[in-house]
Amino acid sequence: NVRFDLSGATSSSYKTFIKN
């Protein structure tokens, strides 16, 4: 599942999401 929770996602988690 692809989720875009920018309000709850941290910068590190966002970077990990981009890698995955």
UniProtKB/Swiss-Prot annotation:
Its EC number is 3.2.2.22. GO terms for molecular function: rRNA N-glycosylase activity; toxin activity. Coiled coil: none annotated. Residues 8-20 have a biased composition (Polar residues). Keywords: Hydrolase, Plant defense, Protein synthesis inhibitor, Toxin. GO terms for biological process: defense response; negative regulation of translation. Residues 1-20 are annotated as: Disordered. It is an enzyme of class 3 (hydrolase). The keyword Hydrolase applies. It catalyses: Endohydrolysis of the N-glycosidic bond at one specific adenosine on the 28S rRNA. The keyword RNA-binding does not apply. Belongs to the ribosome-inactivating protein family. Type 1 RIP subfamily. This is Ribosome-inactivating protein. The lineage of its organism: Eukaryota, Viridiplantae, Streptophyta, Embryophyta, Tracheophyta.
